[in-house]
Amino acid sequence: SGDENDGGLGFDFKWNMGWMNDFLDFMSADPLFRKGRYGELTFSMIYAYSEDFILVISHDEVVHGKASMINKMPETDLDEKFSDLRAAYGFMYTHPGKKLLFMGQDFGQFNEWWEEKSLDWDELSNEHNRMLHRYMKDLNALYKKEPALYELDYNPDGFEWINNISADECIVSYVRRAKNGDELLVVVSFTPVLREKYKIGVPSAGQYKEIFNSNAKKYGGTGKLNSRVRVSEESECDNRRNSIHITVPPLGICIFRKVEQDEDIEKAEESKKNVTAKKSKK
């Protein structure tokens, strides 16, 4: 994708085969042993801006004995298997680079793709497949809605690691940024461990509201979310001056947006004032 005047070929995009190979190798590993392959998850950002990349999971990866995406997930428990795939797709969609996902993988088709037959649409009658399909629909809508997820794909200003060294926990966290400076805080966990009161550094002091969580019940998760706005405190973490405590879903992704003043907090404060005023009158 380099400019022809600079010796490049001048294509609009290039498939990121390095990311694809590392990512699929990482995802195929047992979650309990992924910490030994943590570098495969983070290495792609070292060369992410050397080309205009597309993150690609093509038909080549779901044929000829390579297994469909859902069957690349190593878990035997079906709930965990689909949770893992939701985390994988969430990471893919929040990682810099355009996206290519082959048909059928968006609803978790169990069989490999075969060019002589149609997709197994009947699998959408299964609850797990149907909820993954809904998840992908919402993930695509989020991607389309949030410029931070695509505007600066090929500019280093659009991405910033918060933590890319938590190998033991197998958690990565980072910021995606839009041209106007709007930021999204992304946290992804690749182990089946629910982590409550998990401390994470934030780009700046303020209030952080969760806008997306793969652990929602409508997607097949347990419903353990970050329903309340997290207010940062001046406590150093991840080489950041300010931090928040969150619930990190097992095999999942959660995304936060910094908000100026949450409506729920405003209502709660107004309610407290009213109660105090009534007590004073009495």
Residue map of PLM features:
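Aromatic-lined glycan-binding groove of carbohydrate-active enzymes
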Residues: S28-I70
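Carbohydrate-interacting/catalytic domains
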Residues: F33-G36, D60, G65-K66, I70, ...
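Substrate-binding cleft/loops of secretory-pathway carbohydrate-active enzymes
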Residues: S1-F33, T42-A48, F110-W113
